[in-house]
Each structure stands twice: as C-alpha cells, then as structure tokens.
Amino acid sequence: MSMLRRPLTQLELCEDDIQWLTDQLNKRVLPAVIVPKCEMMDIDEMEPMDQSEPPRGITRRNLRSADRKNRDVPGPSTGECTRTSIAPTLTSARTPVAAPTLTLSTPVNPVSSAEMLRVMPPRVGRRPRASRSGDNDSPLLFNAYDTPQQGINDESPTPSDSPESPNAHLYGATPGNPTSTSGGPSSNTRSHRH
C-alpha cells in the first residue's frame, strides 16, 4: 500500500503544480491578450496588424476583420475605409516586409529578361556548332558504323577489291570466299555492337 500511495501523491503534486502553472499563465497572458484585443477593437488602424500576425489567431482575427469589412460595406465610405486601412499597412511594421518585395520585384523582371538575353547568345553559339557537326554528320546519318572506316577506305585501295562488303578487308575477308561475303555484314554488326 505504501508503494501505491507514493506515486499517487507524486501524481497529485504534479497535477497541482500543473494547475498552479496554468493559473499563473492564464493570469499573466489574459491581461496582455485582452489589452491589445480591446485596442484592436477600438482602433480601426490596427486591422492590418491583425492580418500581419496570422499564427496567433487566424480565425478570430480574420473573422473580426471580415465583420468590420461587412459593417463598412453598406456605408458610403467603404472606399475611404479601405484606403485608410491600406495606408496604415504601409506605415505599420509590415512596411519593411512589403517594401523590399516591391522594390525587388520591379528590378528582378528586367534583370531576368536581361539574363535570358544573355543566356540566348551562347545557345545561338551552340547552334552553329550543331549545324557544323550536322554538316559533317550527314554521312553518319546514312552509315553510322562505316563512317570512320570509310575514311580509311578512301585512303586505301582495298574497297575496290570488296564491293559487296566495304569493310570486309578489315576482317581479312575476300570476295572470292562465299563464307566471307555472307559472314561479312554479320561480323561487322557484331564487332560494332560491342
């Protein structure tokens, strides 16, 4: 029984401590929260501050601002209220956040276009290279495997000896042997596949 009483007393003490801490926190936080709420309810210029602080109370403050907007809608000075509410946003603490975004957004667009213009000339420079290689690659499009060997064939007189398989001379095949003519293309493809 004594073993059961000790944890119970400890739990009770913990609960008492938790309740005491929560009471103190409520006593300290509530007046601090109530004061700005009263100020915000009384002063219309604090509405943008409500919107600029979403993590503390999103739903309540947004509802309050929406209610105020709805109350201002039937009035003839709706535009004036919105303008006055926008003016404090620029003069409030949100200005350092909004000002750099506005100042950065305007020059970033021309800079990005200039960067795009700067990037394009290298691409245009690469295109002539591709066109040059394309001019040189025109035989490669027809004979992808034979192009390096065609250069060798042009220098050597052997291609006249083997008209059926232009690369047969590289593999030691002669046109007189029927096995060489039949095995020539297969040997070419096998050797080039590796």
From Swiss-Prot:
<dbReference type="GO" id="GO:0051321">
    <property type="term" value="P:meiotic cell cycle"/>
</dbReference>
<keyword id="KW-0469">Meiosis</keyword>
<keyword id="KW-0539">Nucleus</keyword>
<dbReference type="GO" id="GO:0051445">
    <property type="term" value="P:regulation of meiotic cell cycle"/>
</dbReference>
<comment type="similarity">
    <text>Belongs to the CDC26 family.</text>
</comment>
<dbReference type="GO" id="GO:0005680">
    <property type="term" value="C:anaphase-promoting complex"/>
</dbReference>
<comment type="subunit">
    <text>The APC/C complex is probably composed of at least 12 subunits: apc-2, apc-10, apc-11, cdc-26, emb-1, emb-27, emb-30, mat-1, mat-2, mat-3, such-1 and gfi-3.</text>
</comment>
<keyword id="KW-0131">Cell cycle</keyword>
<keyword id="KW-0833">Ubl conjugation pathway</keyword>
<dbReference type="GO" id="GO:0007346">
    <property type="term" value="P:regulation of mitotic cell cycle"/>
</dbReference>
<dbReference type="GO" id="GO:0051301">
    <property type="term" value="P:cell division"/>
</dbReference>
<dbReference type="GO" id="GO:0016567">
    <property type="term" value="P:protein ubiquitination"/>
</dbReference>
<feature type="region of interest" description="Disordered">
    <location>
        <begin position="47"/>
        <end position="194"/>
    </location>
</feature>
<feature type="compositionally biased region" description="Polar residues">
    <location>
        <begin position="79"/>
        <end position="94"/>
    </location>
</feature>
<protein>
    <recommendedName>
        <fullName>Anaphase-promoting complex subunit CDC26</fullName>
    </recommendedName>
</protein>
<keyword id="KW-0498">Mitosis</keyword>
<keyword id="KW-0217">Developmental protein</keyword>
<feature type="compositionally biased region" description="Low complexity">
    <location>
        <begin position="174"/>
        <end position="194"/>
    </location>
</feature>
<feature type="compositionally biased region" description="Polar residues">
    <location>
        <begin position="102"/>
        <end position="112"/>
    </location>
</feature>
<comment type="pathway">
    <text>Protein modification; protein ubiquitination.</text>
</comment>
<feature type="compositionally biased region" description="Low complexity">
    <location>
        <begin position="154"/>
        <end position="166"/>
    </location>
</feature>
<comment type="function">
    <text>Probable component of the anaphase promoting complex/cyclosome (APC/C), a cell cycle-regulated E3 ubiquitin ligase that controls progression through mitosis and the G1 phase of the cell cycle. The APC/C complex acts by mediating ubiquitination and subsequent degradation of target proteins. Developmental role in early embryogenesis and the metaphase to anaphase transition in meiosis and mitosis. Required for embryonic anterior-posterior axis formation.</text>
</comment>
<dbReference type="GO" id="GO:0031145">
    <property type="term" value="P:anaphase-promoting complex-dependent catabolic process"/>
</dbReference>
<keyword id="KW-0132">Cell division</keyword>
